[in-house]
Each structure stands twice: as structure tokens, then as C-alpha cells.
Amino acid sequence: MDKVVKFAEPGRAFAKDSIRLVKRCTKPDRKEFQKIAIATAVGFAIMGFIGFFVKLIHIPINNIIVGS
């Protein structure tokens, strides 16, 4: 029985901490949500442009290497 309690204790502590975290969290208000959404969109756009320019630079380099 002692082994069962010893085995189940980490799971029980994790569940207890998780429930406490969920109860403490709050939903973002409209302004905060918009700020997060805009920051995420800007990040996606920047990463997209970086990928586009890297691809744009590597296409001619690849054609030079493969073309010869």
C-alpha cells in the first residue's frame, strides 16, 4: 500500500497545482487580446518576409551552382 501512495503522490500534487493555476488565471480583456494578436501577426509577417528574402537570395545561387 505504501508503494501505491508513493507512486500516486506526484500525480496528485501535479493535479492539485494545475487546478490552482487554472483557478488563478484570468481571461484577457479586449485591449490585451488585441495587443497580443497584433504582436503575433507582426511576428508572423516578419518571419514570412525573412523566409521570402532568404529564398529569393538562394534561388539565383542555386541556379548558378546547379546550372554549371
Curated annotation (Swiss-Prot):
Membrane topology, as annotated: Single-pass membrane protein
**InterPro entries linked to this entry:** Prot_translocase_SecE_dom_sf, Translocase_Sec61-g, Translocase_SecE/Sec61-g
Q: Where in the cell is it found?
A: Endoplasmic reticulum membrane
> What domain of life?
Eukaryota
Keywords of the record, alphabetical order, are: Endoplasmic reticulum, Membrane, Protein transport, Translocation, Transmembrane, Transmembrane helix, Transport
Any one GO MF term held by the record is: protein transmembrane transporter activity
Q: Which residues lie on this side of the membrane: Extracellular?
A: 62-68
Q: Name a biological process GO annotation.
A: SRP-dependent cotranslational protein targeting to membrane, translocation
Could you state one GO cellular component term attached to this entry?
Sec61 translocon complex
Cytoplasmic-side positions: 1-32
Q: Which family does it belong to?
A: Belongs to the SecE/SEC61-gamma family.
Q: What HAMAP family does the database record attribute to this sequence? A: SecE
Q: What is this protein called?
A: Protein transport protein Sec61 gamma-1 subunit
What gene name does this entry carry?
A: SEC61G1
